[in-house]
């Protein structure tokens, strides 16, 4: 049994001196059996308006500046460093005790674009997304792996969005980069047609990108909740770097990833992308990805996707 982190839900822990470190959000704890108490203590400190782990260290846990930002955003707080040298990273991943002021985040307007990678067969989902988020984003662009006629037919149904077409040709990163170039907005949320941002993520988008701009970030990793045949799977948090500045680029034909210095990226753990999957499609995808690139099939991912979610642990 591997216990899940009480901040991000990850179950992969690293040994670091006398601590266990979450390999995702950077939380360090003395005893994994105290994770619930640790998260309550973190929230209490954030609610107090100041977290100074140098002057007032916690006994059971610690966070460095980057880790504190991860935790703060997860629980709906914005943070500002107590002391900052101009030109340095505001929240560095340096294992020093975090020191920051905290305030409750508030919904802010934004001019984020929504980019959708799609196949011609996904027309019904595209129309649903276009209607559901018509007023939630500055613009919506679909990049269709299809023909000009298919793109034109789709555009006629939803004329308030832009529909372009280009063959995927087995290269997910290249297709995402094309979509990045088409958006003409500073920040872009990219989704696939089987994904939907939940209400909490939609409400947070404005303050997230404003905070990211202050902190010099270009790529934000979102959690993805995989719903296989309608049931949440054990594959969580399944981080996806989908909220990005338009100048950020992806690499990797399969399982594409952002090309960005680590200090310019962060987790954004508030809300989630809901990902609807069919169990048979999960099995088929493993075979398809492996055929596209050796090792990309990741059978361990399939096993997690087909196992039920347990909020406490991966068993």
Where are these regions (language model features)?
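Short beta-strand-to-loop acidic/aromatic patch adjacent to the donor-nucleotide binding site
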Residues: 179, 185-198
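Structural motif
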Residues: 117-121, 143-146, 167-168, 192-193
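Catalytic-site signature of metal-activated, phosphate-bearing donor transferases
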Residues: 2-99, 173-180, 197-315
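Short, well-formed alpha-helical segments that are part of the catalytic scaffolds
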Residues: 96-103, 112-136
């Amino acid at each position: 049994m591997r216990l899940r982190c009480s901040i991000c839900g990850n179950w992969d822990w690293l040994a670091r001196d006398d601590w266990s470190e979450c390999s995702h959000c950077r939380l360090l704890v003395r005893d994994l059996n105290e994770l619930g108490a640790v998260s309550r203590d973190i929230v209490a400190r954030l609610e107090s308006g100041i977290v100074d782990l140098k002057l007032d260290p916690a006994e059971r846990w610690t966070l460095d500046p980057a880790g504190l930002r991860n935790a703060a955003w997860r629980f709906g707080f914005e943070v500002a460093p107590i002391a900052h040298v101009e030109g340095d990273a505001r929240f560095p991943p340096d294992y020093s005790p975090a020191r920051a002021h905290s305030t409750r985040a508030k919904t802010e307007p934004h001019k984020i674009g929504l980019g959708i990678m799609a196949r011609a067969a996904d027309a019904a989902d595209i129309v649903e997304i276009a209607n559901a988020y018509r007023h939630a984003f500055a613009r919506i662009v679909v990049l269709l792996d299809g023909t000009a006629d298919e793109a034109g037919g789709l555009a006629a149904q939803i004329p308030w969005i832009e529909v372009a077409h280009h063959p995927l040709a087995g290269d997910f990163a290249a297709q995402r980069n094309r979509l990045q170039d088409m958006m003409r907005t500073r920040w872009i949320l990219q989704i696939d047609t089987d994904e939907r941002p939940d209400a909490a993520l939609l409400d947070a988008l404005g303050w997230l990108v404003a905070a990211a701009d202050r902190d010099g970030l270009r790529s934000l990793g979102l959690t993805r909740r995989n719903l296989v045949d309608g049931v949440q799977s054990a594959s969580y948090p399944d981080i996806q770097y989908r909220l990005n500045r338009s100048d950020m680029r992806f690499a990797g034909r399969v399982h594409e990833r952002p090309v960005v210095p680590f200090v310019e990226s962060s987790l954004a753990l508030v809300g989630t992308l809901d990902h609807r999957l069919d169990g048979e499609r999960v099995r088929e995808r493993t075979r398809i990805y492996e055929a596209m690139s050796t090792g990309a099939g990741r059978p361990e991912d399939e096993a997690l996707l087909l196992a039920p979610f347990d909020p406490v642990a991966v068993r």
